[in-house]
């Protein structure tokens, strides 16, 4: 196993992979193209964290959602999955604010369960 310049592990000459875990479980994704996965237990939508990590449109989505904590967790996993697929890691909260709207490189598949949400980011 080797690591890229941002610390993401990879296997030379092997498929791409991504691993994530939380209290509710573990998730692994493998593909021939860059891929990212994030799994999170449903987390509280803390107002300060919302403002630091979500753009204005996402903030409105969270605040108007019937279940704000689920919406926050959904958006968070989408952003994390893309960052993992890119292999760059989260550099700043500002990066998270603009990550999804400008992103046309990845197709996202989000699955919601009772206690957790996970998203897989597939390279287009």
Language-model-detected regions and their locations in the chain:
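Core catalytic alpha/beta fold that binds nucleotide/phospho-ligands
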Residues: 1-124
């Amino acid at each position: 196993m080797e690591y890229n310049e941002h610390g993401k592990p990879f296997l030379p000459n092997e498929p791409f992979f991504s691993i994530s875990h939380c209290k509710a479980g573990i998730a692994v994704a493998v593909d021939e193209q860059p891929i990212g996965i994030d799994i999170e237990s449903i987390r509280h939508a803390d107002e300060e964290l919302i403002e630091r990590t979500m753009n204005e449109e996402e903030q409105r989505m969270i605040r108007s959602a019937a279940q704000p904590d689920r919406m926050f967790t959904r958006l968070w996993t989408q952003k994390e999955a893309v960052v993992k697929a890119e292999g760059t890691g989260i550099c700043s909260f500002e990066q998270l604010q603009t990550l999804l709207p400008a992103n046309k490189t990845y197709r996202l598949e989000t699955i919601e369960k009772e206690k957790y949400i996970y998203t897989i980011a597939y390279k287009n």
